[in-house]
Amino acid sequence: MKEKRAVKGAVYHILVFMFGLIMIYPLVWMVMSSFKPTSTIFQTAGSLIPETFTFENYVNGWKGFAKVTFAVFFKNSLFISAAATIGTVMSSAVAAYGFARFKFRGKKLLFSAMLLSMMLPAQVLMIPQYLWYQKLGWVGSYMPLIVPYFFAIQGFFVFLMSNFISGIPRDLDEAAKIDGCSYAAVFTKIILPLIKPALVTGGIFSFMWRWDDFLSALLYVNKSARYPVSLALKLFCDPGSSSDYGAMFAMEIGRAH
């Protein structure tokens, strides 16, 4: 029995290891290709180790386009992601506090509608949102990428924080009120410190999603100098001429990190 278990364990670990190699191979290939001359990337696609290591792709990629360095694109991404994340965490925490601690008419219906909104594909809302933002004069700016997140539009984070707050004993709220705390004081001095894990989790996920967002930036940002990194990477690909895949791989590694 012990030998059979040992054999099964060995086979299991070998299969998991092989599956892990298959999953990580594209990433390793991209990293190694970033050190190859662009002209040889696909000629030597079957070989991971470059014949000659070169940092030319990193230098050319960082130079950017039309006198706009890639540092500008990184700053744009950082600004958009940070601002949207702050808005998401703040508004979601306030909305979650309302759902978890207050009773009001239509609460269950509103909470259910919020959960149902999580099941809607983003493409369903794309056209009406674009028309609305166009009427507001926001197209061509960062406003559509930042402002909506200050209104708790992502139900996942509201749901996450609401569950955290529901797990906090109401006795703490009552004790704080006896000491003279208002609802706002209870929220800021009692609730927020106790849901730090949820706030950090929400902040990390929100920042990652906004950092990787490509479609929204493609729709609303129309000046290359204002592109985030996710959108600037496509400038390396030119269907009408040659594409600088080496520089694109190099900058993608920087974006992913």
Question: Each predicted region: which residue ranges?
Answer:
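A structural signal for multi-pass alpha-helical bundles of membrane permease subunits
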Residues: K2-R255
